[in-house]
Every structure is written in structure tokens, then in C-alpha cells.
């Protein structure tokens, strides 16, 4: 009976020493038990190491145990397993319920207890109390002595939570920490390990409970041998000492044996000048000795074992690591299993490592736990509950359907059904109660109902069948979950919904079978394990809280808290693979080469300063009162230092340290202090980078097949552009050509060099077929011509190939425009029927008529989007206000004008008022333009008839002569020309142009420094909604448009002003009759030019760019053309900024002679 301490620095062979001792004992055929006790996470690795060292004989004579396994053995042999051990899930669910019940009585933690993550913090605190033997009596005594009121209140509430938790737990359970307390009790009367020889390895510290167990074992065992990673024993305590944690452990062990009267069998010192691990490697031995030495010594010998790499980013970093691993395997005959990659934040690196290692064909295993929240079963359960608790939202419904767990929606056919369903749901705004109703709408408009075709009726029938399949089980589930029930009742309802109604468990079994048959071990394990976890959590919840009454929301909170405690470990799929993991989880297990990545400031060593519920100051006060708990943040800094030391001493032969200059988001990063330290203790080490690599030969770019192919592409591109490349690339190219698997890819590379996204023109015949209607006529609107002028290719995609965006149930700008135009048209008809004049309308008139028209429009179209929600009801009220304000402004404009409204919504084409505008092309074809003029005003003056066109716009718009010149704003001039040409038929005599104007439909917000009078408000509104466009430069005509315009004033309703002399002020909105003629002639020629290009099949990818305005920014087809201005052949059609006088000159040069009769 006695304690022996085996000590040595990292790499001195402490673990090997223990195994060798066990081997010697086995060779002497022992009759007593031989036990190797290690931390839980290292049991599997240690068993393998012992098996490799000793062979199968070890199984019969020795055991590798953790404290948990030790307890299990004792309870099985000597009793004590009467109460079930509650797992982390049950523990968290119980803590949640305790916090819920105590929450209203809390002060300090009242708000925090409801926050996400607090349960984990509370659970850790409870665990900490138990680990450090803090019980109710200890808490009572300590709280009475605490003077700090805040800490006192905090400890009172923690005590309440702690006691309530234990009270409920111990009704039938114990937790893992209780296990050690129970183990302490049972060991006294248990002879299982009497006379055993025990080795305890890989611990740097022990909790008080673990120390108690060791104390009991010391009394029963023949010998207990404990390894500690320290440089020397019996040394004075120095807080900054690298080995301070293990030296504290040594001191506590010595105190323990003194208190218990146990013999000390001495120390075994494994420290030598060069540790066992580094016998053949002076550089790594120097790092072990000097990394944290003060003062330090420098090693100036040749360096072959350490590399430092400064990466541009994480991708560059991991690619460097991948290339170097392949070099070790190919040139140095390393096995992949001899190599490890470690970092501080493995989650951040997982994706980039997976992608790059796959490219380089490096087998690897990431030693990490994965969250189960994204598994289809967990997603399915949560989305099913979300559907009924969040009123059948689109997001929850399609999460539910896309899990692949409902048999009707599995496979390709199932995915197609979901796509069809999703398209309908998005197009018609299906949510809430609409899922429970038969779907009858198939209108193309979101504002009006339409007659449904037979084809669409059949689609609706099929969609309704699908809807029924989905809704029936969910509706039953919804009804069963209503109101409050016990947790057990909810658990039964949920499980029956999954298993009996939808056969989800059977579906999961089929997936597992499929994965196994297709060598998908990871997926098979995940699906199988998550199903078992779900059932286990459900059972734990029922056991712990089964009789608690709650609603569905609270039940799901409990369930998800339980599920959140589970993570799955990944399975190593091969024996020979690179081991990747967190720096805290990977220990030295025959690691010849080690890559430590992400060695950045604040990352390694970690700068975390999370204190938890109890701050460092709280812990100091509690320590003074006799409660010793886990380390404070200051102590953790030194523990982190020891962790770094341990990591940097894992490698036996080769160490690579890398750090990126930028993180995954592109933010700059600095190297860790460790990098600077390495440079100081090994001054001959050269820091490498993309521009400088020590292992740098011209064949460096030839590695694995995919990366080499990528480099080959770059070389081919350089050669294609005329640059010199190395000769060996020709042989690389030939190799890929000879390999059938790669030949096709090389051909793609070659074609890629010749690739251009420019489209060849289509034939005239094809253009006619694409653009002609069913009457073999090419009919289109002016806005479509403008669209072609913006970008011929976009026009071809939209109107030639008829590409359509996915229809979404939303109120868009075009919908708003249509709605406003229709109401204004109905308003005009209404006042005409009532024999009212615009100039006689009052505010009350306007408001009442508009309200009535809008209400009727919405009421008469039940499927209108404006009936769909309260949000759209608000929009409807807002539209009423805008329209009322607009018609009041129109009324005021008409009061001030001698022009009269002659006609609204005059249609060209559409078999209505006036024939289509016919354009005859030089090539013999004809185009027909259709359109609709919002409003025509007429003035009879001095025997002449003047017309002005008003176009209603829901956004701000002004006439831009430059856009007009380039074919981007032709509409009003086209309408004016057609109106003048047909005026004898329309207004019964030849008319002349008076104006083309835009009217903005709006309810403007006025900005003013002070209060405004009623009259000032009216003037400001008129000014804000002033008509914009072009006017005939004739003082009589302009005065007729605003009869309030006086000398020396500016008009509030049109873009004009009058000088004091009575003539019109200079204004680019004013143009002469001759200029109107020029514009009319030019617009016709421009339209013919555009139509000629269209019929000739020109579909150039040539988007317009005007200053910073680029058509592509608002184009839905840019992903099709893949226009890229950096490509040689991709060019914008730049609209240069010109002065109006220069544009007029250009127009005059083009068509002036024709207007003047030349």
C-alpha cells in the first residue's frame, strides 16, 4: 500500500513507462488486478496503445478504466446501481423546469434564467459544486459569513436551485457527479480492487471527489502510481510556473497521503537532458525545453524539423498543409496515421479542410462532436410543431416537407411534387387557414379573379390531393396538441404522430439500410443514432417530468433542451488517415508529424475571459470562506499556457506552425506571441509564405490530380495569353489526355479558353417565329421597344424565349401602377356619369368616390391580395389616401387650366378605340404597336386645337432628352405622334401638340421649418406634384395650362415661369412646334431602327450604362448572360452625358431635313 509519483516533462515517456511496467507484471503471471486509469476521452486510444504494446494477453490480466468505468465495475460487483444515472439531457430538462418554477421568486437570476444558454451555465455550476464537495450544509455556513450583498443574494438563489434540483433528482436518479460520491461510499466495503496495482496517467489535476476515490484506492491497492507532467518536485510554488497546475496536484496528493497515513514510495524521475520522444531531434527537444523558459537559450544549429508558414488566408494555409502532407507521404514514407493537424477552433476550419483534403485525396478523420439539430428527424419534429404553432407558415411547411421523411415526397418524383406545390404556395400566398381550404384560384393577376382553363383545373385537382395528404395528419396532430396536458401525454402524441400516422421510424430504418448498402457509414450512424437519441430524450423527459402539466410550446422547449445536450462523434472510416482535432482533445499517440494551424493572436493561446455565474472576485471571496471551486480566469491563463506547451511537444519528428493574415471574413489577423517566441529560440528558422517556401522546386505545383489540374489550367491560360511556362506542363497535359477519366475535363479547359458568352445573331425566320403572335403579326408595346434598347439579349430572353420569374405572392410596383390607373380611370367615368366637373370637386367628393371605388374593387375580387391580410388592409387605406390626394391635385390643376380632360385610357390596338400604330420596315416587314394613353386634355384656342398627353406614374419621372435620343424613353412621343396623326378621327379636327407631361400619383410628405397655413400647405403639395415634361413654347398655350400664371411668377402646376415683361422664362421644358415635329420624326425613325435590329435577330449582350446606372443591376437574367465587363468582348452600351443643345443638334442633323421638306 503506497503512492509512487512518476514525473517528467512532455515527451519523457511517462505513458510508455506505465505500459511497460504493466507488461513486465503480465510476463510474471500476476494474480492481482492491473489497472491503468485515464481520463474518459482517452480510454479508447489507450486501450489500442496497450493492446499494440502487450498483445491479447493484456485483456485477461489488465484493464484500462476511467473513473466512470471504475464506478460501473464497483456498483456491479458490490451494489449501488439501484438508482438510474440521469444523463445530461435529463439533467438539463430538470434544471429548465426548476428554473421555470423558481423564476418568479428570483431576483438576481430572474431575467437571466429565461435567456438561451443559461441552463448550460446553471448545469455547469451545479456540476462544479458537486465536483468540489459543496453541499447544502456547506452553502448554508458560507452564505451566513458572506458580507458582499450581491454575492450573498447570488449564492442564496444558487442554493435554492441546487437544492431543488437535487431534491427532484434523487427521487429516483443520480447524476454522474453523484456517482463518484457513491463510489467513495461503496469502495469502503468493496474488495474488488484489494491488492490491485494501479497506474493513473494523463491527468494534470483531480477534483476533490476524484482525490477521495484515489484516497480509498490507496488504502486498498498494493500500489498506486500516478504520472505528472512536471520538471522537478518539491520546488517552491511560482504562480507563473509552466507546471504550476501539476505541481499543485503533486502537493494535494502529498497532503492526502499524510492525512490518511499512507506510505509514500518515492518519485521516479524520467527527466533527462533530451526527453525520450525527442532523442533523435534536437530542434523539437529545444522547443520543449525553451518555449516557456526565462531566460531562454537559442538553438543555432541546422533546422530540419520546424517550419513556420505565414498564409494569406485560411485557404492558402490549408493548401500549404495538404501539399506538405503529400510530400511527407511520398518522399519521407510517412503513413497518414502518423500525421495530425490541430487547432483551437476546429469548427471554423472543418469546411475548408474537408474541401481541400478531398481535392488532394488525403484521407482524414475529424475528431469532433457534431450537433444533431440539423438532422432531418429533429428538423421534421420542430417544423411539424412550428406549422401548428406558427399558423402554417411557408418556411415551416417546406422545412417539414423537404426533410425527405414523408414517403410520398421521397425521391425524384417526390421532390418534383414538392416543387410544384411550392410554386403554387408562393404564387398564391398560401398560409394559415388557406391550407385547410380547397384551393380554387389560378388567376394570373393578384388583384382580379379570372376564369380557370381546363388544364389549370386539372392542376388544381392534383394540388388539392397533395394538400390533403399533407394536411390530414398535421390537422389531427394539431387538434390533439391543443390546450395543456402532462408532458407524458404530449410525448405519446408526438411519438404516435411520427410512428403510427407517418411511419417515420420505418422510413429512418430504410434510410439506414440504404446507407449501409452504399458504404455511407457516417450517414447510417447519424440517422440510426439520432433516432435512438430522440427516443432516449423522450423517455428521460417522461421519467423526469412526465406528470408536469404544460402547453405544447413548453413541451418543445423541454424536448429541445434535452436534445441540445447530445452530440455525435464521427466514426473513423479508415485505419490510415490524418487525425484532425481540437488542441484540447488530441494527445501524443505516436504522432510523428504535427501541423498546428491558426496560431494567431487571441486564438492560441486563447484570450477567452468568460467567468460564468461566479466571477473571479466571487471565487476569491468563497475561497476565503473555505469553498474551493474550479479555476478562475487568471488560473485558466496559466492552464492555457500548459495546454500550448503540451500541444507543441506532441510531434516526434516534424512540427509545422501556420497562421493566416486574414480570417474567413477577410479581417486582418496577427501572429500569436508563440510565433515570435519560436523565432527567438530558433533564430535560424525561416518564416515561409506564398512567395517564399523552403521546399521550393519548380515541380512544387504538381501534387494531387485535382490541384495539379487547377494549376495546369492556369499554365494553359498563361500560354494562351503569350506568357512563358515551364516545359514540364506539356507532359502533364499529355498525361491528363491519356487518362480517360481526365480527358473530358482537359477538353473543357481547352474549350473554356475559347469560350465567349457573346451570342450569335438568330436568323430572321427564327426571330419572326419567336416574336409573332398567333395571327402572324408582331405586336408589341413601346415599353418593350425601350426594353430592347436597354439590352437586346435581355429582351430576347424575356419576350423571345418567354422566360419567366418564379411567381411570388406580393404586391409589386407594376401591380400598384395597374391598380392606381384603374381607379383613376373609374374615378373619371364616375364623375362623368354624375355630370361633375373636375374643377367643381370638393375634398369630400374626392374622398367619398375614391373610398367607394377602392372598396368595390377589393370586395368584388375575393382572391385579391388586398383581401389577404391586415397588412394589405393597411396598404388599401394608404392607397385611398394617395388616390384622394392625387385627384384633389388633378382637380386643382384643372381649376387653374383652360384645358379640359377629353378622354381617359385611350387605347391603340387591342381592337378598341384606335388602330395599332403600324411601323413599316425597310426590309418589308411590319410591326404593330399597342398602347394606352392615360389621359388626353384638349384646348381650343384661336381656331386651333391643342392636345396634351398626361401619363400617370407612381414614381417620380421627368422627361430626359438624352434617354429619348437613345431609345430609352420614347413612350409619350410615340403616343403624341399617333394622336396628332389620328386627331381628325379622335377629336374630329386636325390638332397640334400642346404638351407631354408626367403626373406623379403620391401623397407627399412636406418638409417645413415652421407651421404652414392651409393655403401654404396646398401650394407646397401642388409644387411637389407638379406636372413634368415638355410644353409648347407658346405663351398663350402655356397660360391656358395655368391661368394663374402672372408676370414675374413661377407656375405651381407646370414647369414654366413668366418674366416680368410677360414673355416666358427660359426653360428646357419649353420647345417649339418645329422641335415637336423633330421629336415626332426622330421617334419614328428610332422605332424603325430598333424593330429592324429585332427582326434581323440581333441579340447582343449589350446592357446600357448611364453614369452609375447599369441596366444589369435591375435585370433578372444576368445569371443567364453572365455579362462581365472584365471580359475582353463584354462591353456596355455607354450612354454618354450630353448637353441638350448637342442632342437637339444631332436630332436635327438626322431628321431635320425631312421635317423642313428638304
From Swiss-Prot:
Keywords: 4Fe-4S, ATP-binding, DNA damage, DNA repair, DNA-binding, Exonuclease, Helicase, Hydrolase, Iron, Iron-sulfur, Metal-binding, Nuclease, Nucleotide-binding
Coiled-coil annotated residue ranges, if any: none
Top-rank EC class of the record's enzyme: hydrolase
Gene3D superfamilies assigned: 3.90.320.10, 6.10.140.1030, P-loop containing nucleotide triphosphate hydrolases (3.40.50.300)
Gene Ontology MF: a single term: metal ion binding
GO terms, biological process: double-strand break repair via homologous recombination
Cofactor(s) listed in the protein's UniProt record: Mg(2+); [4Fe-4S] cluster
InterPro entries tied to this protein: ADDB_N (IPR049035), DNA_helicase_suAddB (IPR014140), P-loop_NTPase (IPR027417), PDDEXK-like_dom_sf (IPR011604), PDDEXK_AddAB-type (IPR038726), Restrct_endonuc-II-like (IPR011335)
Cofactor descriptive note: Binds 1 [4Fe-4S] cluster.
Domain of life of the native organism: Bacteria
Family: Belongs to the helicase family. AddB/RexB type 1 subfamily.
NCBIfam families registered for this protein in UniProt: addB_Gpos
Extra information: Despite having conserved helicase domains, this subunit does not have helicase activity.
Quaternary structure and partners: Heterodimer of AddA and AddB.
Functional note: The heterodimer acts as both an ATP-dependent DNA helicase and an ATP-dependent, dual-direction single-stranded exonuclease. Recognizes the chi site generating a DNA molecule suitable for the initiation of homologous recombination. The AddB subunit has 5' -> 3' nuclease activity but not helicase activity.
PANTHER family in UniProt: RECBCD ENZYME SUBUNIT RECC (PTHR30591:SF1)
Protein name as it appears in the record: ATP-dependent helicase/deoxyribonuclease subunit B
Top-level taxonomy: Bacteria, Bacillati, Bacillota, Clostridia, Eubacteriales
